[in-house]
């Protein structure tokens, strides 16, 4: 928005002032807008000449209110805006003057150069003064307007050759290289952030890695020097082999690969190993018969697979055959080879050597060496892999038995598929038996079965053979029919229902129902001491005792588990009695989520009695010492929502409910008096009784359901106490303490008091 400005050296000053301050509404709108621009710091050297705030401040009309008094708050804001406008105008004058002076200097230099180059410089100079006087300046662009009519008709854009391109030199925008010595590895920085002094888990060594030379890796840029050296050696070997092969090809191109390998002498020892491998490969290539590869069969079942591809109806038999072979994929000899050594020395049908492999490594409680612990770690990893493979095997069998929802759908078999299947079976029997004589007859029979069609019977209705009792049957009254089975015949409600379509897997079965995050221990994970286990077996005395005792193992019935739980409870009671008072205060609780400490081990049903009592006692003591750490308290966070109740309104509504009950009581009493005029009333009419429950019931009608949720009996009782103090009410309880009785005097006295 532009306005006219006031200038002191203007002849039409009165006219400008008249036009500037005539419209009061426009003047106030401009003033408010300019004050807002000044407070928002939106005034700069470009738009400072568009604001006439200095003229308005000079007039002082906009600063006066209705009582012709100056508003000093507006005056201070206006003065601040005038200072900003004035300073911006000074900056604008400075920049524009600099541009003008630089333009004049450039024009002077250009004119001098043009004068020197031209032959008639004086004539042109004289004519130039006259031309400069006739030059017109465009007020919009500030550029001179040419007098040539052709130029005026076709306006041409003048390009500034100095600022023709906006690209900056690459060196100015190029990022400087950072100092590599001051750069911190982000992985190491993250490790330092995660490190605190909270415990052993947050130690710095636990967050860092260690290479194969037992060196702590603090930086991700550190690489394995051994691997780097091996990579360099491999590259050198490849280069030497390529160079050697090129030389051999140039000298003796007609010789075979074997002869070149034998004749060439290798001086470097590094090339010996790859050259031997190449010779072995070349020998193998000579013995391979490439002409028989296309004819050879990989497996005996490939022919059956091709038949299945040609005829899809044979797929079911082929899959069943493969599944049967998979079920019996290992023979007894293969099982003996697959099971570790000492497979024949087992106890209760379980391999003790395998049991040792399945034992997970525990802390080094005994004085065993590090090599022995490494062996235990290897055995533990193989045991865990074996357990996963065993789980996967059972999952595969369970998936085969589980069909899902599709299992209960009725399948629609086409007759053509059945006929084709019968013909295929006949052809298979013919090929197996080798009866070539019956070939034509079987083909004719199969073709006859395909061509034969059952003749459709014509439906005929005989109207003469009608039954006399037909009408009685049709128009007989229908009795009440039930499709449900009688209650007396029902044995079990779920007996005639389909089983739940639930897919069981070994992972689900081995997890506890109450605590799904915890798995049952499928195998015994107790680590036996060196005295108990020798090369994967218990002591010979224990094994011989178990073999000599050929008793049938006890069945894991309810008595078995009851005895185990009772024994466990007895052990816990003995532990509690043996503990001192100081240990109870300062000690920590056992971890309830530990596999070995969480009740009875499920493997006790499949294991024999442990003869080594000392080892079991030692293990129990170790468990007591190792598993002492506090349980994390599972705190439930409840949402706290503040109730919004208008207590003043509630108090008025309680008093209104009391008055409504009083009016109902009085109207009921008047009706009784009018109906029974002859009877005398001996009860005290000055005091009346109300129940607190009736008062609350009357309040519930005055609120909506959402508001009524926040109102409780406590709020109502507090309001009732205030009303009792104000109006002299008496509150007493009932005999059963299930309600409150409010005694009040006559309403007239209470209203008069209020």
Swiss-Prot record:
Principal localization? nucleus
Q: Which UniProt keywords apply?
A: Cell cycle, Cell division, Chromosome, Cytoplasm, DNA condensation, Mitosis, Nucleus, Phosphoprotein
A Pfam family of the record is: Cnd2
A GO cellular component term found in this entry reads: cytoplasm
Q: Where is this region: Disordered?
A: 104-149, 359-379, 665-688
From which source organism is this entry? Saccharomyces cerevisiae (strain ATCC 204508 / S288c)
| Family as reported in the entry's similarity comment | Belongs to the CND2 (condensin subunit 2) family.
Q: Which GO terms describe its molecular function?
A: chromatin binding
InterPro entries in UniProt: Condensin_barren_su2
One BP annotation, GO: cell division
The yes or no answer to whether the keyword Cell cycle is present is yes
What name does UniProt use for this protein?
A: Condensin complex subunit 2
Question: Which cysteines are disulphide-bonded?
Answer: none
The miscellaneous comment for this protein is: Present with 704 molecules/cell in log phase SD medium.
The protein's location, in the record's own words, is: Nucleus; Cytoplasm; Chromosome
Q: Which domain of life is it from?
A: Eukaryota
Biased amino acid composition, Gly residues: 118-128
- Indicate whether Cell cycle appears among the record's keywords: yes
Q: Which residues carry this modification: Phosphoserine?
A: 245, 548
Q: How does it assemble?
A: Component of the condensin complex, which contains the SMC2 and SMC4 heterodimer, and three non SMC subunits that probably regulate the complex: BRN1, YCS4 and YCG1/YCS5.
Q: Where is the composition biased (Basic and acidic residues)?
A: 362-371
């Amino acid at each position: 928005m532009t306005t006219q400005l006031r200038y002191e050296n203007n002849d039409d000053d009165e006219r400008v002032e008249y036009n500037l301050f005539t419209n009061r509404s426009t003047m106030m709108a401009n003033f408010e807008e300019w004050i807002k621009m000044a407070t928002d710091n939106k005034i700069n050297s470009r738009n400072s000449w568009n604001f006439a705030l200095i003229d308005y401040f000079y007039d002082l009309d906009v600063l006066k209110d209705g009582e012709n008094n100056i508003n000093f708050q507006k005056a201070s804001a206006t003065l601040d805006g005038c200072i900003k406008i004035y300073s911006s105008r000074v900056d604008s004058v400075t920049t524009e003057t600099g541009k003008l002076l630089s333009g004049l200097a450039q024009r002077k230099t250009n004119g001098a150069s043009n004068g020197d180059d031209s032959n008639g410089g004086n004539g042109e100079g004289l004519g130039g003064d006259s031309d400069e006087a006739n030059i017109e300046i465009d007020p919009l662009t500030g550029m001179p307007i040419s007098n040539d009519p052709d130029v005026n008709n076709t306006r041409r854009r003048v390009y500034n050759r100095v600022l023709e391109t906006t690209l900056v030199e690459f060196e100015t925008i190029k990022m400087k290289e950072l100092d590599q010595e001051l750069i911190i590895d982000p992985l190491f920085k993250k490790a330092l952030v995660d490190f605190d002094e909270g415990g052993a888990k947050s130690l710095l060594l636990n967050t860092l890695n260690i290479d194969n030379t037992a060196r702590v890796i603090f930086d991700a840029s550190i690489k394995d020097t051994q691997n780097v050296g091996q990579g360099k050696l491999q590259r050198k070997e490849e280069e030497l082999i390529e160079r050697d092969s090129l030389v051999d090809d140039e000298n003796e191109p007609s010789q075979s690969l074997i002869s070149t390998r034998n004749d060439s002498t290798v001086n470097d020892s590094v090339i010996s190993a790859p050259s031997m491998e190449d010779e072995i490969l070349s020998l193998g290539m000579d013995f391979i018969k490439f002409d028989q590869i296309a004819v050879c069969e990989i497996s005996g079942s490939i022919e059956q697979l091709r038949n299945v591809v040609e005829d899809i109806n044979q797929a079911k038999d082929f899959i069943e055959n493969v599944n049967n072979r998979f079920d019996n994929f290992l023979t007894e000899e293969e099982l003996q080879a697959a099971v570790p050594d000492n497979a024949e020395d087992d106890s209760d049908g379980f391999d003790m050597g395998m049991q040792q492999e399945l034992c997970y490594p525990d802390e080094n409680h005994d004085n065993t060496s590090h090599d022995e612990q490494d062996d235990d770690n290897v055995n533990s990893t193989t045991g865990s892999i074996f357990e996963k493979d065993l789980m996967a095997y059972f999952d595969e069998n369970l998936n085969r038995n589980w069909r899902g929802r599709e299992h209960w759908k009725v399948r629609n078999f086409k007759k053509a598929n059945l006929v084709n299947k019968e013909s295929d079976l006949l052809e298979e029997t013919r090929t197996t038996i080798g009866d070539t004589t019956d070939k034509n007859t079987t083909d004719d029979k199969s073709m006859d079965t395909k061509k034969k069609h059952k003749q459709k019977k014509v439906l005929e209705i005989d109207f003469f053979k009608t039954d006399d009792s037909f009408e009685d049957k049709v128009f007989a009254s229908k009795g009440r029919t039930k499709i449900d089975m009688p209650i007396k015949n029902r044995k079990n409600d779920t007996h005639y229902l389909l089983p739940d379509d639930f897919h069981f897997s070994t992972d689900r079965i081995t997890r506890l129902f109450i605590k799904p995050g915890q798995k049952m221990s499928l195998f015994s994970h107790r680590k036996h001491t060196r005295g108990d286990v020798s090369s994967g077996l218990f002591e010979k005395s224990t094994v011989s005792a178990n073999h000599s005792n050929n008793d049938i193992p006890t069945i894991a019935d309810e008595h078995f588990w009851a005895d185990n739980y009772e024994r466990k409870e007895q052990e816990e009671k003995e532990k509690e009695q043996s503990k001192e008072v100081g240990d109870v205060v300062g000690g920590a609780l056992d971890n309830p989520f530990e596999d070995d400490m969480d009740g009875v081990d499920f493997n006790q049903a499949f294991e024999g009695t442990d003869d080594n009592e000392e080892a079991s006692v030692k293990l129990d003591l170790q468990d007591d010492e190792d598993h002492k750490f506090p349980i994390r308290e599972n705190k439930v966070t409840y949402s706290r929502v503040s109730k919004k109740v208008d207590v003043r309104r509630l108090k008025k509504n309680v008093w209104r409910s009391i008055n409504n009950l009083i009016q109902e009581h009085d109207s009921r009493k008047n009706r009784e008096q009018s109906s029974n005029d002859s009877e005398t009333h001996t009860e005290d009419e000055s005091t009346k009784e109300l129940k607190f429950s009736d008062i609350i019931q009357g309040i519930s009608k005055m609120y909506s359901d959402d508001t009524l949720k926040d109102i409780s009996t406590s709020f109502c009782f507090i309001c009732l106490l205030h009303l009792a103090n104000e109006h002299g009410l008496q509150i007493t309880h009932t005999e059963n303490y299930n309600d409150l009785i409010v005694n009040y005097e006559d309403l007239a006295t209470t209203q008069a008091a209020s």
